[in-house]
């Protein structure tokens, strides 16, 4: 799906009028002993159908991005990588959905979900703005997805939110890198990245911290120091 979406995003950006730039991405390998992991990442990308992947040596990386560490050993280069503004893109998708008949119910809390057998409908959704019956439900509630899952499933789950903090730098720093630069992924994710934004800023982050408060979006001094 990532590969398919990557192929479609340029056309969607043009049709729906949201900013998109195919700036390419680099995954850096800073130590020779980690090179086999970079090779595995390359092979996984080829298996998944990512086009034009290649591994760059030390000199090629520094020629492409002079501001990365002199200690860089190699990097995986994906010229198909790109950046968007997620806020503009989401609003554009919502506007397009509305034009095509989707109805939004804002300020509406789901109180309960239950199975029914009423004609062609399978589910009843009780909310603060009324009751709805539908054939299917897509649970896209993010960190609250466990709440709705547990309304209908005997196998209960509990989502532990993981908070990530970013540092958004001024546009005067936006030219420090031209590609999206990743570290080699670890077992908990991609780690901290450095990327230009479509608006000309420089974005660094995120951290990764397990929290209990599902609405804990505050930033911290420790998070900034880590970034």
Each model region followed by its residue ranges:
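Dinucleotide-binding Rossmann-like beta1-alpha1 core, especially the glycine-rich loop
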Residues: 1-64, 191-192
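Short beta-strand to alpha-helix junction loop
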Residues: 3, 28-37, 76-95, 105, ...
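Active-site substrate-recognition segment that forms the wall
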Residues: 7, 16-20, 131-132, 141-227
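A structural signal for short hydrophobic beta-strand segments in well-ordered beta-sheet cores
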Residues: 28, 110-116, 194-196
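A short, glycine/Asx- and small/polar-enriched loop/turn
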Residues: 33-36, 64-72, 114-124, 174
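General beta-strand structural signal in soluble alpha/beta enzymes
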Residues: 54-57, 104-106, 139, 204
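Helical element adjacent to the flavin cofactor pocket in flavoenzyme catalytic cores
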Residues: 76-136, 144
């Amino acid at each position: 799906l990532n590969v398919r979406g990557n192929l479609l995003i340029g056309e969607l950006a043009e049709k729906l009028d949201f900013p998109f730039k195919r700036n390419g991405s680099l995954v850096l390998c800073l130590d020779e002993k980690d090179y086999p992991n970079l090779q595995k990442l390359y092979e996984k990308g080829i298996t998944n159908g990512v086009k034009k992947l290649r591994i760059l040596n030390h000199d090629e990386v520094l020629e492409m991005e002079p501001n990365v560490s002199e200690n860089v050993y190699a990097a995986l280069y994906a010229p198909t990588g790109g950046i968007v503004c997620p806020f503009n893109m989401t609003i554009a998708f919502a506007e397009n959905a509305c034009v095509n008949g989707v109805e939004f119910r804002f300020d509406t809390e789901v109180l309960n979900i239950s199975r029914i057998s009423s004609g062609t409908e399978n589910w009843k959704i009780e909310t603060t703005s009324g009751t709805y019956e539908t054939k299917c439900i897509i649970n896209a509630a993010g960190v609250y997805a466990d709440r709705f899952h547990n309304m209908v499933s005997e196998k209960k789950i509990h989502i532990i939110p993981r908070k990530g903090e970013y540092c958004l730098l001024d546009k005067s720093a936006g030219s420090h890198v031209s590609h999206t630069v990743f570290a080699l992924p670890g077992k908990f994710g991609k780690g901290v990245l450095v990327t230009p934004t479509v608006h000309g800023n420089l974005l660094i982050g995120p951290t990764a911290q397990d929290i209990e408060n599902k609405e804990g979006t505050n930033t911290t001094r420790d998070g900034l120091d880590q970034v």
